[in-house]
C-alpha cells in the first residue's frame, strides 16, 4: 500500500466537574475530589481525540456516531475511541499521530501520563501519541476547578491499494 493523502483533524471538549462522578482520562480513573459530568463517562481527552479523528475523515463529530441515547449512557469513552479507529479503518484511513492537551487544575495529572499514553497508543494503533497537561493558571473554569477541557490534533493517512492483479 502506498500513501495517497494525509488529513489533519482538530477536536475539543469540555465538561463541568461535579461531586459524585469519576474523573476519567483515556480510560484511566484519576483520584480527584470531583468528576466530569457527561452522558458517557465524561472522558474529555478521548472525546477530543474522537472529534479530531472524525474531523480528519470528514465524518462529522462524536454526536453523529455516539449520540446521547440509552445505548451510550455511561459508555466507556476509550471503547468509543477504539470504535472510531475502526470506523476510519473501514474507510481506508489509519492514524499517523495524535497530540493532545488537557486543561485542569483540580488535580496534578502528570503522574497519570504513562498509563494514559499506554491506553491511547493501544486504542489508536500508533506509537506517535503525545499528551500535555496545563493548569489554567487560576483562570477560567478549568483554573477555578469548576471544569476540565481537552484539545486534540491528529494526522490520518488515507491508503490506496496499489497492488496489480
UniProtKB/Swiss-Prot annotation:
Reactions that this protein is recorded to catalyse: 4-CDP-2-C-methyl-D-erythritol 2-phosphate = 2-C-methyl-D-erythritol 2,4-cyclic diphosphate + CMP
Pathway: Isoprenoid biosynthesis; isopentenyl diphosphate biosynthesis via DXP pathway; isopentenyl diphosphate from 1-deoxy-D-xylulose 5-phosphate: step 4/6
Site (Transition state stabilizer): 39, 135
Keyword presence, Metal-binding: yes
Cofactor: a divalent metal cation
Enzyme Commission number(s) from the entry: 4.6.1.12
InterPro entries documented for this protein: MECDP_synthase, MECDP_synthase_CS, MECDP_synthase_sf
Pfam families reported in the protein's UniProt record: YgbB (PF02542)
Keyword annotations: Isoprene biosynthesis, Lyase, Metal-binding
GO biological process, one term: isopentenyl diphosphate biosynthetic process, methylerythritol 4-phosphate pathway
Lineage top rank: taxon: Bacteria
Binding site for 4-CDP-2-C-methyl-D-erythritol 2-phosphate: 13-15, 39-40, 61-63, 141
HAMAP family for this protein: IspF
Family: Belongs to the IspF family.
SUBUNIT field: Homotrimer.
Functional description taken from the UniProt entry: Involved in the biosynthesis of isopentenyl diphosphate (IPP) and dimethylallyl diphosphate (DMAPP), two major building blocks of isoprenoid compounds. Catalyzes the conversion of 4-diphosphocytidyl-2-C-methyl-D-erythritol 2-phosphate (CDP-ME2P) to 2-C-methyl-D-erythritol 2,4-cyclodiphosphate (ME-CPP) with a corresponding release of cytidine 5-monophosphate (CMP).
PANTHER family: 2-C-METHYL-D-ERYTHRITOL 2,4-CYCLODIPHOSPHATE SYNTHASE, CHLOROPLASTIC
Protein name in the entry: 2-C-methyl-D-erythritol 2,4-cyclodiphosphate synthase
Organism: Thermotoga neapolitana (strain ATCC 49049 / DSM 4359 / NBRC 107923 / NS-E)
UniProt lineage: Bacteria, Thermotogati, Thermotogota, Thermotogae, Thermotogales
Amino acid at each position: 500500500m502506498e500513501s495517497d493523502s494525509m488529513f489533519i483533524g482538530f477536536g475539543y471538549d469540555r465538561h463541568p466537574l461535579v461531586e459524585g462522578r469519576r474523573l476519567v482520562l483515556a480510560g484511566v480513573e484519576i483520584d480527584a475530589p470531583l468528576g466530569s459530568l457527561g452522558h458517557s463517562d465524561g472522558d474529555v481527552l478521548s472525546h477530543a481525540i474522537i472529534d479530531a479523528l472524525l474531523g480528519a475523515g470528514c465524518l462529522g463529530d462524536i454526536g453523529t456516531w455516539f449520540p446521547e441515547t440509552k445505548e451510550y449512557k455511561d459508555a466507556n469513552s476509550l471503547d468509543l475511541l477504539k470504535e472510531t479507529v475502526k470506523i476510519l479503518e473501514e474507510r481506508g484511513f489509519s492514524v499517523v499521530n495524535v497530540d493532545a492537551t488537557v486543561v485542569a487544575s483540580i488535580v496534578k495529572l502528570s503522574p497519570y501520563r504513562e498509563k494514559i499514553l499506554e491506553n491511547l497508543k493501544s486504542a489508536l494503533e500508533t506509537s506517535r501519541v503525545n499528551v500535555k497537561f496545563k493548569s489554567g493558571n487560576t483562570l477560567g473554569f478549568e483554573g477555578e476547578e469548576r471544569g476540565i477541557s481537552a484539545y486534540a490534533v491528529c494526522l490520518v493517512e488515507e491508503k490506496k491499494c496499489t497492488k496489480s492483479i
